């Protein structure tokens, strides 16, 4: 197997917990503090803008213990906030403008208008495509 020919960032940023370039820190903290089935269901719903795609996802939704997910979210927050700035390794940046997790505005602020491709997609656009190549070709 050869080296990767491209590295694509999709629906996120190098600053995942950041008021201007990711998720606002206070919103993320509130999500961790109040995390439970209702918060998770809201998160899943916000990944989509098409109820049919949400239903498709929910039909095979991940089944993990709530306490495990909450611990993972808290550990992720701690790691992100303690980390040094990350080097941009991506050759392609796709901003999802209908994203209700990472707003399109924050994604554009993070990547820059001149370096990102903007698509009117939700946070989880995968059900709209046959495969990864189909998504990259859109």
Where are the regions that the model predicts?
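Conserved alpha/beta-hydrolase "acid-adjacent" motif
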Residues: 96, 100-106
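Hydrophobic, aromatic-rich cap/lid helix
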Residues: 56-82, 86-88
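Helix-rich cap/lid subdomain of alpha/beta-hydrolase
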Residues: 16-59
